[in-house]
């Protein structure tokens, strides 16, 4: 930085033995992927979110160490105030586990967990509309329950259910006709995954709902009443409790019954450096820092506390599109 202008960047070898200065004629674009793979930084900034996580899995972005965000802060930029992660609801745990140590836990990934089956807390009560975006349930649970894990409940009719649910984007288990999405598991592949997780002890398969409650320590009386009420919503095709769409309701009546213990898993951090519509980093006076541009998960001013994935590929689309537009801007 020369005066108030960013004019280049320094780089080094992995060992830090050799440093290189790179001069930038038109500006520096920061795009290092956020800080999801930096345990110290994540736990310092997102300790409250971490209470509801069993893992942090920055797919394909294992160098997301926060270097770009820190460099921008050193240059005088400011960061979003509220910590935000892209949290999915697919972290599966053993019955004896609880979330809260996302960088130190043994957990699994369960794709089917996003399907809108009945989900209850340790008290045996529903938490929210199970057809909501991935992290809505996690945030609702934090305000409702004594435990930051929940339980996914389904019965032997699940193959029909997941086809009727017709979820889209990365939650889809059934390939849509005429689409170019990469092949999901389908019914056969999902059945194999369920069987494997039953063998691992992460999914409980039982002949009665009472056995399900006992396996996880769920309040049995309340749980059985919740299932009865939920079956009534299915029969009436009307969820008077949370307003879930009728086609995403399911009955839980036909053994064998299945259940698993779930919590959140973070894929990326989304709180970054504040930018303007030209992708320029902003200082504490909301003024652009000349020569400094930020895109991708290093950039902020977009999400706030939640990842509302009401459109498939929302964050991937933002990163790709903003990268293209920023490139044009700087060029």
Predicted regions and their residues:
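A glycine-rich dinucleotide-binding beta-alpha-beta segment and adjacent secondary-structure elements
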Residues: 208-211, 216, 222-306
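Internal hydrophobic alpha-helix adjacent to the cofactor/substrate pocket in enzyme cavities
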Residues: 69-78, 216, 224-227, 316-331
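Short, small/polar residue-rich loop motifs at catalytic or cofactor-binding pockets
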Residues: 112-114, 267-269, 312
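Glycine-rich loop(s) and the adjacent beta-strand/alpha-helix scaffold that form part
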Residues: 15-18, 22-94, 316-319
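A conserved short coil-to-beta-strand element within the FAD-binding core of flavoproteins
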Residues: 1-6
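An anion/pyrophosphate-binding glycine-rich loop and adjacent beta-alpha core
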Residues: 69-215
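Short, well-ordered coil/turn residues at beta-beta hairpins
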Residues: 12, 24-25, 30-32, 122, ...
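Hydrophobic alpha-helical segments, especially N-terminal targeting/anchoring helices
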Residues: 13, 120-121, 275-276, 282-283, ...
